[in-house]
């Protein structure tokens, strides 16, 4: 039987840990068993205890102190050390055969764009531990509601999709922080975006010498046709349930269950 897990990705401050806590809280309320696997050696205290914690193997603070490395160099060192000690990870998660594992990942994009750290861990989980995985990439709504920043976020989400080679959902987090400030129509433009329409807005806010670049980026996003977002309010059980239903549909959680369709996407009006 395949084991099921979801990798929670996204830049620092996107709300990854809050999302993980929201999933755990919702699952507990409906009687599902789940655990958080912390893969961030610089993680802070969480609402829910980590079942598996990379800091039990190696921590960012220890590396910075002992090797006199900066934060990014220390993070890379921590993950290279983890790759050399994957037997530790195997042992830590080896007993969770029929429970849902949520992998809370650090926000540094270079861990899968510049060095093959996360892709290597993904392959190990799939091939050695028989995990059926899904990736969820979070971008915070207050950031990407700016059109030019939206394209930046969309490119980072596409990068994760391509390099990790996992079934993937994109999540627009912290929608509750802006839904009173922006119209529903404007918010929906960023959930299922038409890049060629958004580029006109980007051009209005940037120097004319960047217009060709904006168009090229919009064409790239449009050609892939893979960047759509689900709205998330991490404290709203209905919102978390909707996101989780998409993850369940991708991973087909529970072989004994019939394959099921995801819930209807939660409309902005319902949040």
Swiss-Prot record:
GTP binds at residues 13-18, 173-176. GO terms for biological process: mitotic sister chromatid cohesion; protein import into nucleus. It comes from Eremothecium gossypii (strain ATCC 10895 / CBS 109.51 / FGSC 9923 / NRRL Y-1056). Heterodimers with GPN1 or GPN2. Binds to RNA polymerase II (RNAPII). It comes from the Eukaryota. GO terms for molecular function: GTP binding; GTPase activity. Belongs to the GPN-loop GTPase family. The keyword Transmembrane does not apply. A motif (Gly-Pro-Asn (GPN)-loop) lies at residues 70-72. InterPro entries: Gpn, Gpn3, P-loop_NTPase. Keywords: GTP-binding, Hydrolase, Nucleotide-binding. The record marks 72 as: Stabilizes the phosphate intermediate. Small GTPase required for proper nuclear import of RNA polymerase II and III (RNAPII and RNAPIII). May act at an RNAP assembly step prior to nuclear import. This is GPN-loop GTPase 3.
């Amino acid at each position: 039987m395949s084991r099921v897990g979801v990798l929670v990705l996204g830049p620092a401050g996107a709300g990854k840990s809050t999302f993980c806590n929201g999933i755990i809280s919702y699952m507990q309320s409906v009687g599902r068993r789940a655990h958080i696997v912390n893969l961030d050696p610089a993680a802070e205290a969480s609402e829910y205890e980590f079942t598996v914690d990379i800091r039990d193997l190696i921590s960012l603070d220890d590396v910075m102190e002992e090797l006199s490395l900066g934060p990014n160099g220390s993070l890379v060192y921590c993950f290279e050390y983890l790759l050399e000690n994957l037997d530790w990870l195997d042992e830590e998660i080896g007993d969770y055969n029929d429970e849902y594992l949520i992998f809370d990942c650090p926000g540094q994009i270079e861990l899968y764009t510049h060095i093959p750290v996360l892709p290597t861990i993904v392959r190990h989980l799939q091939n050695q531990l028989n995990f059926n995985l899904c990736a969820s990439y979070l971008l915070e709504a207050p950031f990407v509601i700016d059109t030019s920043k939206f394209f930046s976020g969309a490119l980072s989400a596409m990068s994760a999709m391509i390099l990790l080679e996992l079934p993937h959902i994109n999540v627009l987090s912290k929608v509750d922080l802006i839904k009173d400030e922006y119209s529903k129509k404007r918010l929906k433009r960023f959930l299922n975006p038409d890049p060629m329409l958004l580029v006109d807005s980007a051009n209005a806010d940037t120097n004319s010498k960047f217009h060709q670049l904006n168009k090229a980026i919009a064409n790239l996003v449009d050609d892939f046709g893979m960047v759509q977002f689900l709205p998330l309010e991490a404290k709203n059980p209905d919102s978390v349930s909707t996101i989780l239903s998409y993850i369940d549909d991708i991973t087909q959680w529970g072989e004994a269950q019939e394959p099921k369709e995801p819930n209807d996407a939660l409309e902005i009006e319902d949040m």
